[in-house]
Amino acid sequence: MAMGAVLSSRTFASPLSSSGKQHPPQNNKCTCSSPPTRDKFSRLTTRTTIFQVSNYSRSTSMERFQLSARFHQPVVDSSTNYLTRWFYNANLKRRRIECFLTSDPINTGWLKPRRWDNFTSLDTACVQPDYKIPVRTRADCKAEQYEITGSPLSPSDVPAEAVLIGDTNEISPWWQQFPKRWTVVLLCFFSFLLCNMDRVNMSIAILPMSSEFGWSPATVGLIQSSFFWGYLLTQILGGIWADRFGGKVVLGFGVVWWSIATVLTPLAAKIGLPFLLVMRAFMGIGEGVAMPAMNNILSKWVPVSERSRSLALVYSGMYLGSVTGLAFSPLLISRFGWPSVFYAFGSLGSVWFALWQRKAHSSPSEDPELSKAEKRYILGGSTLKEPVTSIPWKLILSKPPVWALIVSHFCHNWGTFILLTWMPTYYNQVLKFNLTESGLLCVLPWLTMAIFANIGGWIADTLVGRGVSITNVRKIMQSIGFLGPALFLTLLSKVRTPAMAVLCMACSQGSDAFSQSGLYSNHQDIGPRYAGVLLGLSNTAGVLAGVFGTAATGYILQKGSWDSVFQVAVVLYIVGTVVWNVFSTGEKVLE
C-alpha cells in the first residue's frame, strides 16, 4: 500500500516545481514541504506540514474494505491555513491512496488524482489562474485504481501538487496476508490430527479383525503394544535428525512413513501376524519423530510471546484426532468393512504432505516469501543458528532443568496414559455403563483437553505479555497440570454417582491439558537449538511411563482396587510438582 498526502501550499494557479520535497515517515510522523515562495511582502517562505500517522499498518482484514487508519491533526503547520482534524485513509486491495486538501469551497468536488511515476511528482505550471485563493476548510480522501508508472496528467486537468509518500506495501488478499508462522503451526496441527487418527483406528478395528482371524486376547495385546516398539526407537533419533536436517524434512518423512504403514496394515494382517506386528512397529517409527520434529520447527518459527498458544493448538490436534478417529472408524467399518478405515485415514497423509512441501520451511531464513516485517518479529523472539552437527550429550545431561523435564514428563504421562487406556474399563466395570455408553464417554476427555489446552496457552502467553517471567509462567501452568488431576482423582475415590465420576474424569483431563503450556513448552525455552533432542529425551521417559503404568495398573487391579490405581498416580503427580518447581527454569541454559 502507498499512503500519501497531496498538498498544495498556495493558490492553485501558482506553479509548484519538482523541487517539492517528499519525506518518508519517521516515528509515525509524515512531513511535506513545498519549495520557497514569496509572500505579499516579497519575503521568501516555505510551507511545511507534519502529520501524525496512527495505526495505518495495523488495520484488520475486515477494515481493509472500510475506512481505516488516520492522519491526525498536524503537529506542526508553518502556514496559517486551517486543516481539519482527521485525514482518513482507505486501505483496499491493489489500490493506491491519496488524501486531498479540498481547495474549492464552492463546488466541493474532488481534486482529480494524478498518476505516480515511480514515487516522483512531475509538476508543471498551470497555464491560467482558474482558482481563487482558498481557505482550506476540510480534508477529503479518495481511493482510485492507480498505475504505478505512467505519464503525468495535463496541467490543465489538475492543479500543481506535492505528493508525500508514506509507505509502500503490496496489498494482497487476506489469505496471502495470513502470518506464515501460523500457517506452519496449522500444518503441524493437522499432522498431529492425522497422527492420532491413524493411531486410534486400530483400537476400533481390532474387534472385527480379532473375530475374523481368531486372535486371542494375548495376541490382541501384543498387536496393540507393537506400535510402541518403533515409537520408542525414534524418539531421540527423531530429535537428532530434526536438529541436524531441519524439522520440515523429518516431520514430512514421518507423516509419509506412517501413512504408508497405515495403508499397508490390512495387507499385512492378511499375510500373517508377524507381518502385522512389523507394520505396526513401522507405523510407530514414523509417529515417533513427529513430536521432536514439530518442536524443532516451532522453536524457529514461533516467538516466545506466542509459544504457549502455538504448542497448545498443535497438541490439541492430537486430542481432536482421537475424537475424529473414534467417531468415524465405526461408521467406515460398518459400511465398508474394517480395511476401509486404514485406507481412508492413511490416504489423507498424501494430501497433507503436498501442502507441507509447498507451504512449510524448516526456518524463517529458508522461506523466500516471508515478509521482512514478520521475519523481524519472529527473530525478535527466537534464535536462528547453523544446523546442529553434533549433540553435546554431556552438557545436556548435566543441566538440572533437563532432568526436571525428564522426571516431570514421566510423572505426567503415568497418570495420563492410565486414564486414557483404562477409562473404558472403569466406565464399564465400576460405573456400569454399557460398551456403547463407555465409548461415547471416552470422547469427552479428549474434547476437554483440546479446549483447555488452548485456554491454558492463551493464559500463559497473556501472562508473558504482561511481564510475568517465563519461569514463573511455566511453573504456574505445570503446577495446574499436576495438582488439578491429583485433586480430581482423589475426589474420584469419594464420589458415589456415575455423573460425578464422569465429571471428575473430565476435569482431571482438562486440568492436565495445562501441561502443554508448562513442560511441553519448556524444551524451546531452555534450549531452542536442541529442542528436538530435548523433547525426544523427555518423551522417551513419558512413553516408558505409559507402557509401565498401563501394565502396572493391570497388576494392581488383580491385587487391589481402583482406589489404589488412582493413589499411585496422585503420588507421582505430587512428586512431579515438587521436582518441577524446584529444578525447572524458563531461561535458556543450552546455547
Curated annotation (Swiss-Prot):
Transit peptide: 1-76
Biased composition (Polar residues): 8-36
GO molecular function, one term: L-ascorbic acid transmembrane transporter activity
GO CC entries: chloroplast inner membrane
Keyword Transmembrane helix: yes
Keywords, alphabetical: Chloroplast, Ion transport, Membrane, Plastid, Transit peptide, Transmembrane, Transmembrane helix, Transport
Region annotated Disordered, chain positions: 1-38
InterPro entries tied to this protein: MFS (IPR011701), MFS_dom (IPR020846), MFS_Na/Anion_cotransporter (IPR050382), MFS_trans_sf (IPR036259), SLC17A9-like (IPR044777)
Pfam families per UniProt: MFS_1
GO biological process assignments: monoatomic ion transport; xanthophyll cycle
Compartments, as annotated in UniProt: Plastid, Chloroplast membrane
Disulfide bonds: none
CDD domains: MFS_SLC17A9_like
Record field: transmembrane: 184-204, 220-240, 249-269, 271-291, 313-333, 336-356, 402-422, 440-460, 475-495, 531-551, 565-585
Function statement: Probable anion transporter.
Family: Belongs to the major facilitator superfamily. Sodium/anion cotransporter (TC 2.A.1.14) family.
Name of the protein in question: Probable anion transporter 4, chloroplastic
